[in-house]
């Protein structure tokens, strides 16, 4: 089975000391083949780990069985200079399995060809047979946050130029449209107020009658 291990060593150590810790941890692996070690550098952590803010990153690649990392897990948990370890079994990862599956590879190629064909037609509607120079071609450029915020305002301005601003029509009392709107609004408020008054009178009369019955 193919394994990847990410090892984080205490960042307060020097590079030589971190390499010694890395080599010591590699000796705990058993029955491994093709071990490859890559130093990824000293990086800041997103959050403190064992009160440390930085760590030396190492990546291991090797082939082994289920028992290859058993001793490594035990010693890594005991060693205080090891901040964190991550063991990845590539043969259990769906992405890795799909990358070595011939059927998945063929399906991915078919989807890619279909995608390139659609992009070619959209970019060249007059001549759809022109080959695509880049698979990442797009019909429209991506907009920034500022452009996205400005776009609704531009669309609203186009509507105002074509249809007129409804707010300005309401603000002008000399236009029939405003008078009609204002009259309808006043009638609705009067009807609602009359209904509320009638409801209040009925409730008051009902309570008054109940009080008389009790007497």
UniProtKB/Swiss-Prot annotation:
SUPFAM superfamilies: Ribosomal protein S6 (SSF54995). GO terms for molecular function: rRNA binding; structural constituent of ribosome. Residues 188-198 have a biased composition (Low complexity). Keywords: Ribonucleoprotein, Ribosomal protein, RNA-binding, rRNA-binding. One of its GO terms (biological process) is translation. Binds together with bS18 to 16S ribosomal RNA. Belongs to the bacterial ribosomal protein bS6 family. This is Small ribosomal subunit protein bS6. It comes from Mycoplasma pneumoniae (strain ATCC 29342 / M129 / Subtype 1) (Mycoplasmoides pneumoniae).
């Amino acid at each position: 089975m193919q394994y990847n291990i990410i090892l984080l060593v205490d960042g307060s150590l020097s590079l030589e000391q971190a390499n010694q810790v890395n080599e010591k941890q590699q000796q705990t692996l058993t029955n491994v083949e093709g071990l490859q070690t890559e130093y990824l550098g000293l990086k800041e952590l997103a959050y403190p780990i064992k009160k440390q803010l930085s760590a030396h990153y190492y990546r291991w690649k090797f082939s082994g069985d289920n028992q290859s990392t058993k001793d490594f897990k035990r010693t890594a948990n005991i060693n205080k200079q090891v901040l964190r370890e991550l063991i990845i079994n590539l043969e259990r990862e769906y992405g890795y399995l799909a990358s070595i599956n011939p059927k998945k590879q063929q399906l991915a190629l078919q989807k890619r060809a279909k995608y390139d064909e659609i992009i070619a037609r959209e970019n060249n509607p007059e001549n759809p047979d022109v080959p695509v120079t880049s698979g990442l071609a797009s019909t429209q450029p991506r907009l920034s946050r500022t452009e996205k915020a400005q776009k609704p305002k531009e669309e609203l301005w186009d509507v105002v130029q074509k249809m007129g601003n409804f707010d300005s029509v309401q603000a002008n009392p000399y236009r029939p449209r405003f008078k009609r709107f204002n009259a309808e609004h006043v009638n609705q408020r009067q009807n609602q107020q009359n209904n509320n008054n009638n409801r209040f009178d009925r409730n008051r009369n009902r309570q008054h009658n109940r009080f008389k019955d009790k007497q």
